[in-house]
Design a protein with these regions (language model features):
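Non-heme di-metal
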Residues: 1-304
Length: 304
């Protein structure tokens, strides 16, 4: 029997409250103490240092590094003219840039740890630090392919305003799209893992290095997806499921490389039917799963 339920499984309000506390304990044990001034976490900082100390670099430069730098902020060449390795790396940058722009914009709008009054507020601040740690891992991925000149550039004034206002929206309104965004990232990382053997076959050391860094991110994103699910009641979870297809298509339409790398239709199917059994056992073992998504007796949690 499958050990896990769908991510869309119903959850009682008491269960969700208890799961926030459980997630908060897991997060601190997994990622360490918050270094708020650095937007960092102690254990995540150690993980990055280990990857950097390995100093793994690709055997060869990209066939045309100038092509990468010309297209990594915005595609200016015909994507069909780019080799798949360059397409993969320009896509990765654009995806990570959205993440970086979002967390940078909302950082000042989220209560500091000292001003956080609830577990969920502490989680929000802490999780932003985790996301900044992910950007540092992405940066190391580009350095792995000897791309040392990239810069993290804001998306523009309009998008910056959008991201800055997001924390001001009520939780019931923002939770469903935020949950779908996490599910979109998790689904993407699973598909990227499948692409690595094909696109990076000639760079086995760099491929494995990137895969391990993506695994670190995937472990966190799996936990973030469950944590985001925890905010949502029955109406919101039904709305979330209906949002998957339009949100996925709208997001990937803005990343031209995705048409040449990803099967977005398949990703939508996987997200709509997602349960934790789809993940590798070692990833699940290092991550966090809500209690109501496990096939364990639930008698200890009272109804509400």
């Amino acid at each position: 029997m499958n050990s896990y339920r769908s991510i869309f499984s119903p959850a009682r309000s008491r269960e969700r409250r208890d799961n926030f506390e459980d997630y908060w304990i897991y997060s601190q044990d997994h990622a360490g103490e918050i270094l708020e001034d650095e937007r960092n976490l102690t254990r995540k900082k150690e993980v990055l240092t280990r990857f950097q100390n390995l100093a793994i670099r690709s055997r060869s430069l990209l066939s045309d590094p100038k092509s990468f730098y010309r297209n990594y902020l915005r595609i200016v060449d015909d994507p069909r003219s780019l080799d798949r390795k360059t397409l993969l790396l320009t896509f990765l940058y654009k995806f990570a840039r959205h993440e970086w722009a979002g967390i940078s914009a909302v950082w000042d709008g989220i209560p500091t740890m000292a001003r956080s009054r609830s577990t969920t507020e502490k989680i929000s601040r802490y999780r932003l630090c985790e996301e900044f740690c992910h950007i540092r891992l992405f940066h190391e991925m580009f350095r792995t392919f000897q791309l040392d000149q990239i810069e993290w550039v804001p998306l523009g004034k309009w998008m910056g305003r959008v991201y800055r206002y997001l924390p001001k929206f009520p939780e019931w309104l923002m939770s469903p799209p935020a949950f779908v965004s996490e599910l979109m990232g998790l689904t993407l990382y699973r598909h990227l893992d499948r692409l690595l053997d094909d696109i990076l076959a000639d760079e086995p050391e760099a491929r494995d290095h990137v895969r391990m860094m993506l695994r670190e991110i995937m472990i966190d994103e799996l936990a973030h997806t469950g944590q985001r699910r925890n905010f949502i009641g029955p109406i919101g979870i039904a709305a979330s499921r209906r949002m998957i297809a339009p949100m996925f298509r709208m997001f990937y339409r803005d990343l031209p490389e995705s048409a040449y790398l990803l099967d977005v239709g398949k990703m939508i199917e996987e997200a709509t039917a997602f349960d934790y059994s789809a993940m590798a056992p070692d990833v699940i073992a290092s991550s966090w799963v809500p209690s109501y998504c496990r096939r364990e007796p639930r008698t200890s949690v009272s109804a509400s």
